[in-house]
Structure formats: C-alpha cells, structure tokens
C-alpha cells in the first residue's frame, strides 16, 4: 500500500499557478533531500545551528545577519516584534501584550495584500498611510513625523511594478531620519536573484524572503536578512531561546514558530543552490515552456493565446511570463478553470477578467502538452453544450 497515494489521497496535480502555499510551494531538489537525510539522524544544538546557518546565508549576500524562520509570515511577526521591544528588551517577557511605548507600525494603503494583518500578531497596531492610489513623498514624510514618537517600524510590501508606489530608497531615507527601522516583505520576489541584495543596498533594516518558493526549500520556511541589531533581538525571542529563573523555565513569542533542524539545513542548501542557478537559462526555459503551450494549442477559432508579462497583482513573481488565453464564442474562462481541476491529473490555473492564465514556473516536462490538450478538449465540449 502506498500511504501517500492511497491513504492521504496526495496523488499530485499539475501546477500552472506558481509557487503558492496552497499547492505546496515548490518541490525539493535531490541535493536538498540528501541534506535532510544527513541531518535527520542527528541531535544538534538548535540555537547554534540556526546561528551558523544564518551567518552562512548572510555572508553569501553581504548582509550583516540572517535568520531562517517558520515561513515568511513568521518573519514578519518576529521582525515587527523585535522592533516593538528594540528600545526596551525586557518587554520580550510581555509580548504580544504590550502597554504604552511605540506600538504603531506604518504601512501603505495601496500595497494591498492578505498578509498585512499578520503585523498585529506581534502586538503592534497597524496605521495605513495614503489611499489606494498611493501617497506623495510630502504626505508620507508628514505622516511619519506626526506618528514618529509612537512608531516602532514601517513595513513595506514589495509589489513592483505597483503604480504610484514610493520607491524603497525614499521610504528608507525618510524613516531613518526619524530613527524608524524599515522592514520589507519580499517573500515571492525571486527571481531576479539580485533582489536578495537590492533591498540591502537600499538600506532597509530587514528584508524577508520565502524559503519555499523560488529558493526551493520547504514551503514553511522563510529567510530574514538584515541588521545584526534587529536579528539579534529576533534570536532572543525566537523558538530556541529559553530562560530559567526561580519561577521556572520561560519561552518566548517565537516558540510557536519552530523550524526543524531538517528545515534549517534544507533552506541553507537550497539557498546555496539558488545562488548558483543560471538565471538567464532559467528565464529562457520559462519562455520556451510558454511557447510550447502556444504551439500545442495551435490555431483555434475558439481561443487566442499569447505570452505576456503579468500585471503587479498576479501571483508573484511577475518576472515570470504567463500564457494568456482569451476564449471566444461565449466560452467562460472561470468555468474552464474549474473543470480543469477535475481533469486526470487535476490542473490548477487562474482566470482574471474573463481570461485564463498559465504560469510555467512549476510545470514539469511534458505537462505543457497535457494542459493544452485538456483546454482544447474542454473548449470543444463547451461548444457542443456538454
């Protein structure tokens, strides 16, 4: 009996959406799997392992410090929490229930995403700046000045090419003039690899990446790069820190965000492999996969297809091209997307504004043809009214 297939019903799907959490993030390479087997039979000092892994990653990209977290979302919570107690480290005993002090975290209202509320898990209060159309430099600076004595950090969600977005360099310049640290959530902003260094060059205090997307580690891992000051505070409230006093043993906020030894090692190995990747060849492969889909679809009176660079609000990163399919003759793209999930094997893709989109990033060899044939088959059935 195959437990994965027969008991868990995990027979796998064709992923034409991307490295999204809901489809498992990414697949693990042979090198990563080997590293997991090597460490899984050992006991280790977890705090030491976490520090050594962080130091290794930091050296690779020229960061002061680095830390592997339980996903990028945990990195948001921990980095914000570190900023909340930055001036008063003893407040770590009270997280997330803080009273007084700098509790505000400023964010941008036009940087719309589902992860913003995670900031509040740290105990912070979210204060949005501007509106859905962005904010001017003058208004941003005035708002920062107004709330500076109550603000612990500014969180910036990397969503280029978001229209009317303040550039990160200007955000850092103004924030630092008031002594406020800047945290960037760039979880899915790889490739390009240069983004690992781009935000560090801009002077941000922390930049966060998912370990389970382009980097290729477990889906529930994240990487925090930044200043030694803030990441040292994160270690102090992290999952491996314990204190013993007369009242007993004490753990901290990060205890609920544990990262296993296997995940730490896997993320370090995956990170190293990602840095060595031939990015030009990778991007060429992405475009070739898209062209293969176009070729398999062929000329069809019921649809037209082309390769596009997606808009900012699509699943990240938007550096990866997409195949856009525009159906004709009244065929509903949403309906096709839902029916593809019932294909054998199931195919997961997205629709937006009446069009269907295919992301080549997670497609295995030969899946381009399977997807194309399924779409053509469903299109014919729709025309017949089936």
Kindly give the residue locations of the regions a language model identified.
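Short, Lys/Arg-enriched, disordered terminal segments
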Residues: 1-3, 380-386
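Conserved PLP-enzyme active-site core in the AAT-like
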Residues: 2-27, 54-272, 294-298, 374
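Conserved C-terminal alpha-helix-loop-beta "cap" of PLP-dependent enzymes
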Residues: 4, 294-373
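A glycine-/small-polar-enriched, mobile loop at the entrance of the PLP active site in fold-type I
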Residues: 14-52
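Structural motif of enzymes handling amino- and sulfur-group chemistry
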Residues: 35, 247-321
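Alpha-helical metal-binding/catalytic segments enriched in His/Glu/Asp
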Residues: 36, 223, 358
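Short strand->helix junction
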Residues: 43, 161, 189, 364-365
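A common structural junction motif
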Residues: 241-243, 341-348, 376-383
């Amino acid at each position: 009996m195959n437990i994965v297939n027969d008991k868990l019903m995990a027979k796998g799907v064709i992923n034409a959406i991307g490295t999204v959490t809901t489809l498992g993030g990414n697949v693990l390479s042979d090198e990563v799997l080997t590293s997991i087997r090597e460490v899984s039979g050992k006991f280790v000092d977890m705090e030491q392992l976490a520090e050594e892994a962080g130091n290794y990653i930091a050296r690779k990209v020229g960061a002061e410090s680095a830390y592997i977290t339980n996903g990028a979302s945990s990195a948001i919570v921990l980095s914000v929490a570190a900023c909340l107690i930055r001036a008063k480290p003893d407040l770590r005993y009270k997280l997330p229930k803080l009273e007084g002090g700098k509790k505000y975290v400023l964010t941008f209202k036009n940087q719309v995403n589902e992860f913003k509320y995670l900031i509040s898990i740290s105990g912070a209060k979210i204060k949005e700046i501007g509106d859905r159309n962005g904010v001017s430099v003058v208004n941003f600076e005035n708002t920062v000045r107004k709330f500076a004595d109550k603000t612990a950090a500014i969180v910036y969600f990397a969503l280029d090419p978001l229209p009317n977005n303040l550039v990160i360099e200007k955000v850092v310049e103004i924030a630092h003039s008031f002594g406020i640290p800047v945290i960037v959530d760039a979880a899915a902003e790889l490739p390009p690899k240069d983004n690992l260094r781009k935000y560090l060059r801009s002077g941000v205090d922390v930049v966060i990446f998912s370990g389970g997307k382009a980097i290729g580690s477990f889906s529930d891992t994240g990487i925090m790069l930044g200043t030694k000051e803030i990441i040292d505070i994160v270690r102090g409230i992290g999952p491996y820190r314990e204190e013993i006093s007369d009242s007993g043993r004490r753990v901290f906020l990060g205890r609920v965000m544990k990262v296993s030894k296997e995940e730490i090692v896997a993320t370090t190995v995956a990170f190293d492999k990602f840095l060595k990747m031939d990015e030009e060849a990778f991007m060429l492969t992405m475009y070739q996969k898209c062209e293969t889909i176009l070729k398999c679809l062929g000329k069809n009176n019921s649809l037209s297809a082309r390769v596009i660079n997606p808009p900012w609000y699509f699943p990240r990163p938007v550096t990866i091209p997409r195949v856009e399919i525009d159906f004709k003759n009244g065929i509903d793209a949403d309906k096709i997307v839902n029916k593809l999930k019932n294909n054998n094997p199931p195919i997961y893709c997205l629709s937006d504004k009446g069009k269907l989109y295919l992301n080549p990033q997670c497609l295995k060899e030969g899946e381009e043809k399977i997807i194309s044939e399924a779409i053509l088959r469903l299109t014919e059935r729709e025309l017949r009214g089936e």
